[in-house]
């Protein structure tokens, strides 16, 4: 973390998400209570810490299961939502089995594409509502949807219909707050 806030990763290929395990450190220590010798004390304890970890996690599968549980838990999801607006946005969506949902939309045609028929327009409305000032362009948003849907155990699917992209996404009633 930096300044007791989680670091923000914008990498969209999934490499960070597959490896990232989030630990929160939000108990801020005042300057008067900070131990100036803490780094040296921790360095002296590293061999003991390693022995303890090896003893507690002699079975690597148990350690792996605990890390996966933490990585995929509610607290980790909340942090992912705070750091990635596309992941936050996906909580307001339903993912269908087939690409028979909203059209992707985008471009400059605001008459043809509205928040009722365009996933990208819904995303832009969400970004404005959430006070997020840097929305992704249509292509980057579409790429970001696949890993964001996976965070919720869903799959993002698209298909081409008459030269347009149709998604497997519909909005939930929770979207009414920003539509």
Place the predicted regions along the sequence by residue.
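Feature primarily recognizes SF3-like P-loop helicase cores of small DNA viruses
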Residues: 1-179
């Amino acid at each position: 973390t930096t300044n007791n806030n989680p670091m923000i990763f914008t990498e969209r290929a999934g490499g960070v998400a597959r490896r990232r395990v989030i630990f929160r450190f939000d108990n801020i220590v005042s300057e008067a209570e900070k131990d100036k010798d803490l780094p040296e004390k921790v360095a002296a304890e590293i061999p003991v810490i390693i022995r303890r970890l090896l003893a507690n996690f002699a079975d690597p599968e148990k350690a792996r299961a605990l890390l996966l549980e933490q990585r995929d838990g509610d607290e980790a999801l909340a942090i992912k939502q705070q750091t990635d607006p596309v992941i936050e946005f996906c909580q307001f969506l339903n993912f269908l089995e087939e690409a028979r949902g909203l059209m992707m939309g985008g471009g400059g045609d605001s008459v043809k594409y509205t928040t009722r028929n365009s996933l990208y327009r819904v995303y832009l409305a969400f970004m404005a509502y959430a006070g997020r000032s840097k929305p992704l362009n249509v292509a980057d948003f579409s790429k970001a949807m696949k890993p964001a849907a996976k965070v919720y155990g869903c799959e993002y699917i698209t298909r081409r219909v008459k030269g347009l992209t149709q998604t497997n996404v519909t909005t939930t009633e929770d979207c009414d707050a920003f539509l």
